[in-house]
Amino acid sequence: MSKQEVILCESLETSLGRAIERCPHDKLFILTDEHTQRLCLPSLKEVSFLKDAVEICIGAEDVHKTLETLASVWMALSQQGATRHSLLINLGGGMVTDLGGFAAATFKRGISYINIPTTLLAMVDASVGGKTGINFNGLKNEIGSFAPADSVLIETEFLRSLDAQNFFSGYAEMLKHGLISNTAHWVELLDFNTNNIDYAYLKNMVGRSVQVKEDIVEQDPFERGIRKALNLGHTAGHAFESLALAENRPVLHGYAVAWGIVCELYLSHLKVGFPKDKMRQTIQFIKENYGSFAFDCKQYEQLYAFMQHDKKNTSGTVNFTLLKEIGDICINQTADKDTIFEML
């Protein structure tokens, strides 16, 4: 898998101009959702080299991350004359970069694309690393491919218009990166004043968080080994997310991951000895900022069934990423049903 270029922008217009120059193309398309079309696209439409770009807009939120939406993007590309040499720019959050990346990867067997993430979650996670896809049959990211963007352009000025819930959704992935990397990054994430955001310092933290993911992806682009470290919190988290969708009470991805981290740090303590004090500090931070996911023991079987569908599983066992210590990662860990119920 080719290595994508990730740029923490000083000037989005300059960085985008250079990224487009590196991708020779016959036609340019911009994919947005209803929110980014209104809030983010106007600042780019003034750029001269985008004046002829064809706009494609899809519904916002994860409920639109579907085969039907994907087909509508394919249809728009086809009807507007896209060829194998066209270029797609994805301007949006994780849903847009995931679905747009998959549309680009599959249209005419693959066209070039650029990601411009507009949410914190997309900046530190979804747009980086080459994973693309859609939800299917009630399961998160069930259909997709590894297809890295040619460039990922991170403009943290977009974060100034982000609401608190979407800020914390992305921050959960940053917290995960702190846990799997080093104590210093973990501490700065717990100590950061989320009530009075210093955006200059946040930009630096975003850079460090992205670097954690980039370093891991470069070692293991297709998730056969160490890249599974990035799944901390996601086995339980995806189960919470799928249950919430099934019950028509969708939750933001990062909130599900945060609740998944609570479960999987407890499992880490049980199985591999993750320190109780660091587990409690992290869980306290999550409880204060994310609350808790409402479910009861009657739903354990359903949550367990969702975990059994997780893509990381092998030979019928539920696979977890656990921690012995901050930065000391244990991949390919399993737990039996009783232990998983105790974790929940």
Predicted regions and their residues:
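Generic secondary-structure signature for well-ordered alpha-helical cores
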Residues: 82, 148-151, 157-164, 172-184, ...
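A glycine/threonine-rich phosphate-anchoring loop and its flanking beta-alpha core
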Residues: 102-194
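Active-site segments that bind and position negatively charged phosphate/pyrophosphate groups
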Residues: 192-301
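Non-catalytic interfacial helical region
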Residues: 77-91, 98-115
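ATP/NTP phosphate-donor binding region
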Residues: 1-87
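C-terminal charged capping/lid subdomain of soluble metabolic enzymes
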Residues: 174, 274-344
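Short glycine/serine/threonine-rich phosphate/pyrophosphate-binding segments
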Residues: 95-101, 123, 239
